[in-house]
């Protein structure tokens, strides 16, 4: 999965520059979709809500965060290196976007730990 961080990267660009980057971004994404390397991807709205420990709902993301998530691509690749190679082609990198590359877990890590603890207790 590619997670795109930074939402104000285009500030200071002219309309023409923004259009050029947008065109490059869409060409990149459509190419990944056509090749089967990307299976989904969307930008995220700027506003959201956060539910915490006591089920208190607060506004988010917070303005002081410089790492606001702006969107994602869900990839279908064989290796982390392949995902990293795709991330390095992100048209937003020269403008300050940061791309986090994460594998989607096949199982919740907590459930895996519980299962391992149960197996250890039986041994």
Where are these regions (language model features)?
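Conserved, structured core segments of small domains
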Residues: 1-123
């Amino acid at each position: 999965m590619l997670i795109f961080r930074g939402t104000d990267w285009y500030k200071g660009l002219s309309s023409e520059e923004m259009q050029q980057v947008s065109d490059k971004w869409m060409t990149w994404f459509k190419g990944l979709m056509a090749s089967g390397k990307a299976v989904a991807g969307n930008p995220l709205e700027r506003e959201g809500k956060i539910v915490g420990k006591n089920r208190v709902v607060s506004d988010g993301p917070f303005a002081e965060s410089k790492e606001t998530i702006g969107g994602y691509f869900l990839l279908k690749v064989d290796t982390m290196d392949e995902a990293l190679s795709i991330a390095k082609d992100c048209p937003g990198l020269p403008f300050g976007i940061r791309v986090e590359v994460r594998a989607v877990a096949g199982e919740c890590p907590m459930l895996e730990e519980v299962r391992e603890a149960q197996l250890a207790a039986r041994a």
